Amino acid sequence: MESKSSSLPLFFQKPSGTQLLGLLSVLLVGLAVLISHQPQLNPSNILPLWVPVLVSAIVAGIFGMWIVPLLRRLKTGQIIREEGPQAHLKKAGTPTMGGLIFLPVGLAAGVIFAGFDPEAIAVALVTLAYGVIGWVDDWQVLRLKSNKGISPRMKLILQIAIAVVFCIWLALTAPELTTITFFAGLSLPLGVFFWALAGFAMVAESNATNLTDGVDGLAGGTGAIAFLGVGALALPAHPGLSLLCACLSGACLGFIYHNRNPAKVFMGDTGSLALGGGLAAAGILSGNIWGLLIISGIFCIEAVSVIAQVTYYKATKDETGQGKRLLKMAPIHHHLELSGWPETQIVGAFYLINLGLVLLSFILT
């Protein structure tokens, strides 16, 4: 294995953060251009998606040049968990709350590009609401100088409350969404059970993206690819929502300029909770909950790896209270780290896998 690995080009063994930024830029712009050249997806009367992607990326990158020093002056240094990978301890003190870079830019640009479309505004408000939960959590962590913010119970209650309000609004304005459409014309009418599934998807997605935010550039990059994928699935029926997703995708790309390895800023819960909440809301509103599941494959695996680790540990506890672990550490990106994968190799692999999932969603929806 070692000889095979050493024969790979250096980029595939240990790419730099700047190389990964370049890779992500090519993937996003290339995908946006590809979508824009599909008349059935992006009719001529709809702005090509690559335009909002590029505009938001540039604006977010510039905005971050002001926000990062501000966060540093406000002493928003990240508290690193001692039980995490030891290599991460050197990251202590890196400013957090980096979601303040891409959320204002992505949401404002998205609503403007969408012409203040009601669907875009609704998803923007959901994204902002989840971001506020994350901001409060980040602020509590910094105020108490510990790694514990608001209680998990309170965080969950707030996440559920936002999901319930959004689902009630959807039930009143778009009751036809209760039928899930799969590939080959297959469909599944769920009736009122759809809203329970939709609410669960929003809360689960928000927490899954939060778990994914553990390596420089990982959550922001995979979130950027996922948002563009969901935006493409929303076309041509939901052009305003699609433009919002494209702007959030581009804003995440601009954020990665500052978050690439070695990161100058972390997104914190401010950004990671908002990513998942916004993705889920966009997928549900556009009637693409099946496509959302496929595109969110990386986030699902991250969440399942944590659930499996905890469940297996509890199930194998002996009389001393010690259990066995399925992984060296969860989520799975930490397992790969402790297995010898460089951070940047993990991030690059996840970017490519996520792109593959987006393309798969196009085929299967």
UniProtKB/Swiss-Prot annotation:
Keywords: Cell cycle, Cell division, Cell inner membrane, Cell membrane, Cell shape, Cell wall biogenesis/degradation, Magnesium, Membrane, Metal-binding, Peptidoglycan synthesis, Transferase, Transmembrane, Transmembrane helix. One of its GO terms (cellular component) is plasma membrane. InterPro entries: Glycosyl_transferase_4, PNAcMuramoyl-5peptid_Trfase, PNAcMuramoyl-5peptid_Trfase_CS. It comes from the Bacteria. Pathway: Cell wall biogenesis; peptidoglycan biosynthesis. It catalyses: UDP-N-acetyl-alpha-D-muramoyl-L-alanyl-gamma-D-glutamyl-meso-2,6-diaminopimeloyl-D-alanyl-D-alanine + di-trans,octa-cis-undecaprenyl phosphate = di-trans,octa-cis-undecaprenyl diphospho-N-acetyl-alpha-D-muramoyl-L-alanyl-D-glutamyl-meso-2,6-diaminopimeloyl-D-alanyl-D-alanine + UMP. It is found in: Cell inner membrane. One of its GO terms (molecular function) is UDP-N-acetylmuramoyl-L-alanyl-D-glutamyl-meso-2,6-diaminopimelyl-D-alanyl-D-alanine:undecaprenyl-phosphate transferase activity. Belongs to the glycosyltransferase 4 family. MraY subfamily. Catalyzes the initial step of the lipid cycle reactions in the biosynthesis of the cell wall peptidoglycan: transfers peptidoglycan precursor phospho-MurNAc-pentapeptide from UDP-MurNAc-pentapeptide onto the lipid carrier undecaprenyl phosphate, yielding undecaprenyl-pyrophosphoryl-MurNAc-pentapeptide, known as lipid I. This is Phospho-N-acetylmuramoyl-pentapeptide-transferase. It comes from Picosynechococcus sp. (strain ATCC 27264 / PCC 7002 / PR-6) (Agmenellum quadruplicatum). The gene is mraY.
